């Protein structure tokens, strides 16, 4: 990781922080936590003995350590949004991991500033799964039921008068049948302590908008809220700095505040650097707050200057330029790390998606970690932020519907205030496939939520992921949304466009093609709900669920109709839980197959299909399947090529198999080059791609693999920060003596880590594998897996060694660099 990344990492920990003066201090509670599953009557009390509890660091997901088991959260339900009418046993729906139950966390913290006079102290939880009850020094400080939202509570009056040795205890409870996917468990996001003067800018206390934006000028409006400021004459001095730290605008204003009104300042930035995926420029507003010439607070807000418009019959415009979303939906887990947030893991995921050409993320179906939103700001990924998978009608027996009536507005307000200054966020979604959409008065609930968005942030439009097209077209639900968003149902898009007043259609959730990396099934044909005895799906990318479709259909819609706004594919990454099409009593199967990238962060073949359409800057030439089929000699073994070149020629052992060109013969022929009648014989398979002028542009070769010979290790993370958190992802492969990957190899690999780091986890992308991620061993899947090492806080070198019986071992070194 470069030094600039280290600086950005530090900024991510506290995007709104004090710069000097010691007036505001924010720190994380990461180390020295004690944890135990189970309920303890006296655990909130300071005198409670937790010495025998497990010592953990936060963020922490208690369930990811397993074990996998069919019985964990076994559900018998009918998934109505998938068209099911009869309840069936669902195994692995929430990942087969032990997230259900009660857990307690305990720690202590000091606030020595209390000795110097009156202060205010706030605890902020970025996410706690779930039904969090927070206790400080034996007294309940707050309760927040929704595990995905950020919440905060004022604990000033609960602290010891000297500010020292304050006991914090958090009780969490996950009920069975409370989720449709793996939610994680515990304090899986960061916990902050914020210390300020009595009069201060509160959490999320600024609101930045850009009412006018052009290439030559941008107006910036900053509303600053202040607590305990009524009746006081306030002076605020604000500098706006560009990404180089240069002051580009300055204002000093004074006014008397009453009735909780915000302090308003207006600025002009000349020749602004506009935020976009191609150029994610960011600014900082640094505000100093004075009362009677005394500096009482200093607050920093990061924002971007950009203009968004959604125009009927035209589409989405960013900074005046029409574009269609090339987005993906992602659940919140980080594969083998579980739900515990990690910035370097998030960055690795996002960079893989960006190389594919992805430019947008939908946070399905919950509020995201703040680190994800900050990274999208920096890297240039647009976002649709979505809070709910259900409203007041249940999808899950113990889901959010239990809290909706009382808590929905509070959850929405927290979410919007948290992320309304982030330029990456271009729209809000108020829900996903909610059963309420088909109720006659369902539009009233949608209107209630949409109006909260409009009230708290009138600068962004609102959508909702709708899947019951007939209902929402007839009952007014779809017509009252700012942007009608549809999940699948591609054959109904044109009908929706013709009937709805918005004259726009957004693919809020698309495709749901299923595949297992490196697994190929014969014969090759388009199939819905295809299942096999090995619980895998074919990587020919021709299989989907009964309610979904193949990627080519969505590509064609986006290209052929000006009123389509693009798509958010289900999903960018495989995730824990929801193992369709094997979710009905088909154990073992603990993770999804929808991902373009597998659970080990290894791209599937489908990755290159999207890349060939979405990545306009670089060439793509990818061939499948592998070419090691000892049992298929003489049998038809189709070959697919995913490329952004218009035509290519295939050779098997030097003999041409013909030239294929993209055509309108079928929707698949528009986007794939396919040789359906290749007769397998071992040897060399080569594809030569030609450019539009007919010149040879690029070639790719796959060879039949010999016997497995050795392990190989490779990483893109040659250097990482020595911060005790950063990760290096290491790809592990088995190759023959000539270096060809052995695509069927599934040996057990053992890992050993020495030096300035530790073993963190491994994954192989096999949804049926029950190896535990945290143990230093993992079976290969389709000849590959990913191992992850973590830095310590001491600079040096991390040595990872991989061994497997009968194979030559391999070593790799990662440098851990001081901050």
Model-predicted segments: where are they?
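Extended acidic/polar, glycine-enriched regions
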Residues: 160, 223-311, 675, 681-682, ...
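Accessory beta-strand-rich segments of carbohydrate-active enzymes
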Residues: 25-27, 38-39, 95-207, 229-230, ...
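Short glycine/proline/serine/threonine-rich loop/turn segments at secondary-structure transition edges
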Residues: 116-119, 160-165, 179, 269-282, ...
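Short flexible loop/turn segments that cap and initiate beta-strands
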Residues: 46-48, 233-237, 278-284, 644, ...
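Extended carbohydrate-recognition surfaces in non-catalytic/accessory domains of CAZymes
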Residues: 21-124, 178, 184-187, 199, ...
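Short S/T/G/P-enriched beta-strand
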Residues: 310, 612, 618-638, 647, ...
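Extended substrate-binding grooves/exosites of carbohydrate-active enzymes
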Residues: 37, 61-67, 154, 190, ...
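Beta-strand-rich structural segments
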Residues: 222-226, 288, 625, 639-642, ...
């Amino acid at each position: 990781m470069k030094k600039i990344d280290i600086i950005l990492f530090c900024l991510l920990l506290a995007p709104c922080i004090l710069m000097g003066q010691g007036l505001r201090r924010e720190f994380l509670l990461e180390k020295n936590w004690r944890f135990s599953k189970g309920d303890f009557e006296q655990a909130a009390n300071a005198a409670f003995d937790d010495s025998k509890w497990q010592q953990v660091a936060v963020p922490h997901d208690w369930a990811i350590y397993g074990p996998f088991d069919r019985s964990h959260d076994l559900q018998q339900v009918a998934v109505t949004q998938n068209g099911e009418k009869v309840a069936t046993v669902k195994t692995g729906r929430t990942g087969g991991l032990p997230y259900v139950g009660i857990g307690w966390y305990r720690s202590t913290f000091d606030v020595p500033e209390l000795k110097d006079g009156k202060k205010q102290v706030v605890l902020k939880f970025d996410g706690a799964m779930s039904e969090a009850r927070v206790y400080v020094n034996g007294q309940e400080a707050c309760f927040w039921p929704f595990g995905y939202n950020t919440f905060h509570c004022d604990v000033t009056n609960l602290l010891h008068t000297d500010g020292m040795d304050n006991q914090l205890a958090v009780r969490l409870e996950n009920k069975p049948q409370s989720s449709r996917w793996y939610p994680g468990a515990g304090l899986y996001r960061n916990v902050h302590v914020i210390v300020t003067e009595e009069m201060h800018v509160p959490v999320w206390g600024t609101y930045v908008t850009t009412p006018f934006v052009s290439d030559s000028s941008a107006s910036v409006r900053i509303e600053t809220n202040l607590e305990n400021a009524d009746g006081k004459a306030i002076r605020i001095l604000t500098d706006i700095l560009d990404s180089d730290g240069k002051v580009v605008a300055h204002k000093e204003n004074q006014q008397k505040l009453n009735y909780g009104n915000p302090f308003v300042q207006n600025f002009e930035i000349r020749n602004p650097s506009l935020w976009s995926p191609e150029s994610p420029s960011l600014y900082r507003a640094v505000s100093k707050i004075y009362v009677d010439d005394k500096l009482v607070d200093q607050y920093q807000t990061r924002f971007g200057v950009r203009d968004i418009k959604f125009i009927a019959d035209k589409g989405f415009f960013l900074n005046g330029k029409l574009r269609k979303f090339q987005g993906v939906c992602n659940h919140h887990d980080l594969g083998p790390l579980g739900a515990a947030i990690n910035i370097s893991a998030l960055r690795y995921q996002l960079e893989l998606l960006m190389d594919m050409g992805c430019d947008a993320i939908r946070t399905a179906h919950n509020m995201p970690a703040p680190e994800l939103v900050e990274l999208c700001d920096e890297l240039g990924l647009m976002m649709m932020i979505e809070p709910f998978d259900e409203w007041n009608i249940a999808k899950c027996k113990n889901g959010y519907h239990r809290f909706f009536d009382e808590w929905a507005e509070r959850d929405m307000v927290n979410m919007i205030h948290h992320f309304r200054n982030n330029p990456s966020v271009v729209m809000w979604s108020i829900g996903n496939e909610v059963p309420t959409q088909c109720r006659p008065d369902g539009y009233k609930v949608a209107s209630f939520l949409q109006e909260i968005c409009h009230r708290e942030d009138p600068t962004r439009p609102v959508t909702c992921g709708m899947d019951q097209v007939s209902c929402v077209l007839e009952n007014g639900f779809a017509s009252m949304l700012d942007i009608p968003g549809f999940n699948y149902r591609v054959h109904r898009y044109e009908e929706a466009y013709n009937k709805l007043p918005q004259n726009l259609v957004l693919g809020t959730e698309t495709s749901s093609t299923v595949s297992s990396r490196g697994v190929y099934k014969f014969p090759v044909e388009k199939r819905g709900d295809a299942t096999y005895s090995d619980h895998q799906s074919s990587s020919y990318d021709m299989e989907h669920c009964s309610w979904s479709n193949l990627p080519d259909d969505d590509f064609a819609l986006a290209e052929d109709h000006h009123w389509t706004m693009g798509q958010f594919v289900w999903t960018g990454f495989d995730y824990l839980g929801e193992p369709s099409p094997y979710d009905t009593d088909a154990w073992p199967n603990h993770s999804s197959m929808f991902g373009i990238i597998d659970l080990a962060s290894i791209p599937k073949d489908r990755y290159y299909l999207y890349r060939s359409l979405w990545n306009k800057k670089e060439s793509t030439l990818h061939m499948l399947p592998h070419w090691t089929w000892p049992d298929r000699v003489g049998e038809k073994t189709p070959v697919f090529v995913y490329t952004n070149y218009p035509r290519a020629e295939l050779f098997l052992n030097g003999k041409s198999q013909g030239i294929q060109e993209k055509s309108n013969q079928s929707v698949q022929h528009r986007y794939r080059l396919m040789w359906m009648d290749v007769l397998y014989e071992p040897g060399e398979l080569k594809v030569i791609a030609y450019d539009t002028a007919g010149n040879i542009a690029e070639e790719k070769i796959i060879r039949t693999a010999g016997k497995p010979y050795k392990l190989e290790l490779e990483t893109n993370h040659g250097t990482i920060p020595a911060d005790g958190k950063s990760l290096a992802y290491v790809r592990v492969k088995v190759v023959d003596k000539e270096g060809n990957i052995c695509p069927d190899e599934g040996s057990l690999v053992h890992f050993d880590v020495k030096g300035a780091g530790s073993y963190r986890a491994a994954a192989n992308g096999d949804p049926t594998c029950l190896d535990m991620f945290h143990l230093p061993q993992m079976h290969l899947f389709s000849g590959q897996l990913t191992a992850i090492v973590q830095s310590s806080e001491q600079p040096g070198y991390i040595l990872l060694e991989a061994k497997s019986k009968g194979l030559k071992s391999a070593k790799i070194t990662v440098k851990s660099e001081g901050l």
